[in-house]
Amino acid sequence: MPHEATRRLEFDAGHRVPEHGGKCRTPHGHRYAVDVTVRGPLGREGFVLDFGEIKAKLGAWIDEHLDHTTIYQRGDSLMEAMAALNRAAKLKPYYAMDAAPTAEALAELIFGVAQRLLDAEVVRVNVHETPNCSAAWAP
């Protein structure tokens, strides 16, 4: 049975779920925690994958694209107007997704990025919006 290892990465971001009937329709923010689980045989150092490599590769992508920005659904007119103001002020760009930026959609997005960047089998990504609420993506 292969080993699994999980690394937690954290970031702060705003988002809005435009079709939500409740408070998530209003732009707001979270302190996200992302648990990335990889599986495989132990390498010569005794790791599936060095936790530092996960942080260096996937953490750097998260820092560049998601941390301290606003994540929105492409076509959301309110958020696209806010993103244009953000660009005009030369601030960090907003991050546009094809789907509503829910924890579920972020888990799928980050899973795909992790698969491209990490030198191990990615088996699951779990995104925590709050300490009590999370969503996972696994193939």
Where are these regions (language model features)?
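Charge-rich, low-complexity N-terminal segments
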Residues: 1-139
